[in-house]
Amino acid sequence: MQIKFWPQDLKLAHTWTIASSVTSGSDVTSVGIVQLTDRDGTVGLGEAAPARRYNESTPGSLDFIAKVDATKLSFDNIEASMKYVESLASGQFAAKSAINVALLDGAARKAGKPIYDLLGLGFRNNHHVTSFSIGIDKADVIRKKVLAAEQYPVLKLKVGAADDKANLAALREAAPQKWVRVDANEGWKTKEHALEMIEWLAQDKFIQYIEQPMPADSNPKDIAWLKARSPLPLFGDESYHTAKDVDHCAECYHGVNVKLCKTGGISNAYEALQVARKAGLKTMIGCMIETSILISAAAHLAELCDYLDIDGNLLTTNDPYLGVTAEKGLLSFASAPEKLGLRVRAK
């Protein structure tokens, strides 16, 4: 097996700001691309989309990948390959995700199947709907963003800043009755303030749920207190990394948001979704700012999800890959350039 890897800068259509970084909005982000090639010429693609929230970076991810001995990786034995990768260092979930996705891409190609069939899940084109994210911004910019996102039936509004009420009002001026999911990104610091904001949001009958209302390291009793009183469902994002977090999240939330960059890849995300479902939690799969490699990888798990928020590639202007599409928010592989593996190809 040979491995190649490189950084890829992604330009954002709008400056991206969320509650955990309200002072440092960005208009460019960087991801790491991984390409594995075996002796038969089978290629597997992967992507690392690290988050500063988890003390990871693209340079750090690529440094980790540089330490991987590709001769110890095999499309024919993903479990052993990942056991080796895990042994190299703790953490580094984004980098491990890139390798896991590339391994599954290659394995599915060799099996003559797309990944969703390799996993036994299948995929229904034009059935799953992704939300489209609106970052924290000035009210007039929010209005313009919402109008530009007219084709998407569901929006996700980032909150947790001083202008939350003005921003929701601006969204509603442009889209009075569109379904909205609200993501506080740990922005409400006390249970009382969080409940006050959620009760205000619940007056809007077209809001579906609230994501990560309080910091993940809050006292679990405070989050459970909030869950018991919240008029809207609560989803844990920063609180749910892997399947090991399920007991805590079952006490504190109604659902969880799984991301490949948090779990360490498709294999662990599959487990995290299955375990959450068995615990009675609603499930969603989310993303960071990513190319179509990682967005498509997440889409292969759609059949395990109640909700999807995989729009990271739609927020960029220079996605270098083609894969799953989201016309009018409906996910589809019907026009994907590849039939096997991730069903992704470079433009």
From Swiss-Prot:
EC number: 5.1.1.-
Keyword Lyase: no
Any one GO MF annotation of this record: metal ion binding
Gene3D superfamilies xref list: Enolase-like C-terminal domain (3.20.20.120), Enolase-like, N-terminal domain (3.30.390.10)
Domain of life assignment: Bacteria
Positions annotated to bind substrate: 156-158, 259, 309-311
Enzyme type, top EC level: isomerase
Keyword list, A-Z: Isomerase, Magnesium, Metal-binding
Amino-acid positions noted as binding Mg(2+) in the UniProt annotation, renumbered to this chain: 183, 211, 237
Cofactor note: Binds 1 Mg(2+) ion per subunit.
CDD domains in UniProt: L-Ala-DL-Glu_epimerase
Cofactor names: Mg(2+)
Family in the record: Belongs to the mandelate racemase/muconate lactonizing enzyme family.
Function: Dipeptide epimerase with a broad substrate specificity. Catalyzes the epimerization of L-Ala-L-Ala, L-Ala-L-Ser, L-Ala-L-Thr, L-Ala-L-Met, L-Ala-L-Phe, L-Ala-L-Tyr, L-Gly-L-Asp, L-Val-L-Asp, L-Val-L-Glu and L-Val-L-Phe (in vitro). Can also catalyze the epimerization of L-Ala-L-Glu, but with lower efficiency.
Note: Part of a large, functionally divergent protein family. Protein modeling and substrate docking were used to predict the substrate specificity, prior to biochemical analysis.
Name of the protein in question: L-Ala-D/L-amino acid epimerase
Organism field: Pedosphaera parvula (strain Ellin514)
Lineage: Bacteria, Pseudomonadati, Verrucomicrobiota, Verrucomicrobiia, Limisphaerales
